């Protein structure tokens, strides 16, 4: 059974490995210090090094993951510190030194931080692992999602409407996002392939026959309307607008959109377009992302004060 402590924020610290630079010429050192310039690969330590005011070179930076337990002893509460401050400080110092000795065994390269968060598998004998939340255990991996997208693209059927969808994956999963119909048509693709597609061409103005068919569709879609041909209906006006629809004979043919305005027709068709992507597609948290769903599934890391370690040789 997994430990409940895996969902708690973890603490970590950086260990900076460095080495001293041999002074070949003292004059060059003094001239460099007087000019105030320094190289990006070197730094001047103030009070953190055994040899202050000396130049050192960075060797590597290691990320150390601490235990999930408290860094200090939990027995020393703020109220106990007021009554027994000396004893508590002694316990804190001893516990801090013991924790510091354990840091070397829980270290990794700082560039492996992202892989550590997402790829380490839990162990029943070790409660220091980093894993996903229990509610996200059903989320498939990136490889599984890529295979699923290949099947979706293979089985894609061209719809009757000319619609091209260019948006991000998060927008495809949101039912509130509407898309404008375009001239070109493309199969479901990722944001990268959609960005490489051709530019969208505006729709042409609908001709007379398409406008009449559209009015008939509006009649059939209304609950209280009867299927009637626009040519045989009395008072038929193909270019009817929303401003001159006062008569009862032409009120059934006019709707909230303007037939003479193609932009309103586009807006009406857009609101009734079903998304090509399913809304229940799993999220992929194995790729870097700054959106809300990734921050929710990430683990909070509290960084302690960095340590410095001198490398000899």
From Swiss-Prot:
Coiled coil: none annotated. Residues 239-260 have a biased composition (Low complexity). Residues 24-53, 190-291 are annotated as: Disordered. InterPro entries: DUF4667. Residues 211-229, 261-284 have a biased composition (Polar residues). This is Uncharacterized protein YMR206W.
């Amino acid at each position: 059974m997994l430990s409940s402590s895996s969902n708690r924020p973890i603490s970590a610290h950086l260990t900076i490995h460095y080495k001293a630079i041999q002074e070949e010429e003292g004059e060059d050192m003094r001239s460099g210090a007087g000019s105030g310039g320094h190289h990006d690969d070197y730094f001047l330590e103030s009070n953190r090094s055994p040899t202050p005011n000396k130049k050192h070179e960075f060797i590597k930076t290691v990320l150390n993951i601490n235990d999930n337990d408290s860094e200090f002893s939990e027995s020393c509460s703020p109220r106990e510190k007021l009554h027994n401050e000396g004893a508590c400080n002694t316990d804190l110092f001893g516990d801090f030194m013991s924790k510091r000795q354990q840091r070397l065994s829980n270290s990794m390269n700082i560039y492996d931080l992202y892989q550590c968060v997402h790829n380490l598998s839990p162990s029943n004998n070790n409660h220091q692992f980093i894993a996903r939340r229990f509610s996200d255990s059903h989320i498939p991996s990136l490889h599984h999602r890529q295979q699923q997208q290949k099947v979706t693209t293979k089985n894609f059927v061209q719809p009757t409407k000319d619609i091209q969808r260019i948006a991000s994956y998060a927008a495809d999963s949101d039912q509130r996002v509407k898309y404008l119909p375009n001239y070109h048509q493309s199969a479901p693709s990722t944001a990268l392939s959609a960005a490489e597609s051709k530019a969208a061409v505006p729709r042409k103005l609908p001709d007379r026959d398409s406008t009449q068919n559209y009015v008939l569709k509006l009649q059939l879609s209304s609950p209280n309307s009867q299927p009637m041909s626009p040519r045989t209906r009395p008072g038929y006006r193909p270019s009817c607008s929303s401003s001159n629809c006062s008569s009862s004979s032409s009120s059934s043919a006019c709707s909230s959109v303007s037939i003479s305005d193609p932009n309103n027709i586009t807006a009406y068709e857009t609101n009734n377009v079903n998304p090509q992507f399913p809304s229940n597609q799993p999220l992929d948290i194995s790729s870097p992302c700054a959106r809300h769903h990734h921050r929710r599934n990430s683990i909070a890391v509290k960084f302690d004060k960095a340590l410095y370690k001198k490398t000899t040789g």
